[in-house]
Amino acid sequence: MKNTTNYEETRKILEDNINRLLNEKDRSMAWLSREIGTNERYIARLQRDELVPSLQVICKIAEVLRVSVADLFTKKEG
């Protein structure tokens, strides 16, 4: 059986959820980068798919946005 959730889909879900959560909280990527201890270039490179975030960074993002890591990877409908 083929796994239908491939890398590109998973990256898109993560990106969409981070953007949605930032919008809901009226926060920016600059704010997120400061809160997780990175610079804005790092976040921009993540968005352009130029690097893969470490598990440590994903956990920090979830903590700062006050969601579970699983929530970051769960596709939201609508």
Region spans (language model):
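Short alpha-helical DNA-recognition segment
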Residues: 25-45
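Short amphipathic recognition helices of helix-turn-helix/homeodomain-type DNA-binding modules
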Residues: 71-78
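Amphipathic, hydrophobic secondary-structure cores in small proteins
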Residues: 42-59
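A short, Lys/Arg-rich alpha-helix, primarily the initiator
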Residues: 1-27
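DNA major-groove recognition helix of helix-turn-helix/homeodomain DNA-binding modules
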Residues: 56-71
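The alpha-helix within a helix-turn-helix
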Residues: 22, 33, 62
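Residue-level detection of the helix-turn-helix DNA-binding "recognition helix"
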Residues: 23, 37, 48-50, 77
